[in-house]
A protein has these predicted regions:
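Transcription-machinery-associated regions
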Residues: 1-95
Length: 95
């Protein structure tokens, strides 16, 4: 089960990275999204698990206010949930 989730997360990150300007047409939004995705890319070596520290980490990568980061994170979470439902139901990542 953990391997499946790790596989899904890798595919999710790849999908969002490849389509970042389609999902987030504004340059600043795309940069914020990429910094969030970077945390997913580094998840195996990250030692930060609380929300406050994650937000701080993102703000260090991109100069953005918390509400803007939350807005981008919410959009990514929505995509994650939609794609994960399909992945669980059909066993593959739908692009």
């Amino acid at each position: 089960k953990n391997d499946q989730l790790a596989d899904f997360v890798d595919q999710f990150v790849d999908y969002c990275t490849e389509n970042i300007y389609m999902i987030f047409p504004k340059e600043k939004d795309a940069r914020i999204a990429d910094s969030i995705l970077e945390l997913f890319r580094r998840r195996d070596i990250l030692e930060i698990f609380n929300k406050k520290a994650l937000y701080f980490n993102i703000r260090e990568m991109v100069d953005a206010k918390t509400p803007k980061i939350t807005s981008i994170a919410t959009r990514l979470a929505r995509i994650f949930q939609e794609k994960y439902l399909i992945y669980q139901e059909h066993g593959y990542f739908e692009h």
